[in-house]
Amino acid sequence: MTTFWSKRRTTGKHRQVKKHYTQMTLQEKKQCVKLLQDTVNKHKYLELSSHCKTKIKNKINFSKLVGFIFKSNNAPFNIIEFNITDFHGEKQRRIIFKSPTIVTIEGVSSYQYLVINLEDGTIITTYYNGITDTHKTLDLDYYDANLTIK
């Protein structure tokens, strides 16, 4: 599977502050789900950004995704990250959410991750990791365990 690597990373500490799910309490994960629910209730949809449309390799079942966010007791365990990103001078709260559907990408069973902008319900981008990926290269120095989720 090919990996997309952007030269314009948002992971720089000057552009983004973020909290990884391993640093969150269960209550914080539930708060992230509540923020997603509030976003869907307010905007009535989740919409793919033009950037996301160039990255997506499968069809998203939006009714299944939204149903999972609202009805599944497992939704908090699909929260991967909460972040606040400086996007052209505006602060955007974003959640990375693991889709409940396993997809096959380039012959590899994969999890799909969605970066959802809480300000407008836009799915900013998506990426895929094989289901056996253990994230050995994850650098928690980029994360802030003290970030308040709100």
Per-range role (PLM):
Residues 1-150:
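Ribonuclease/tRNase effector modules and their secretory precursors
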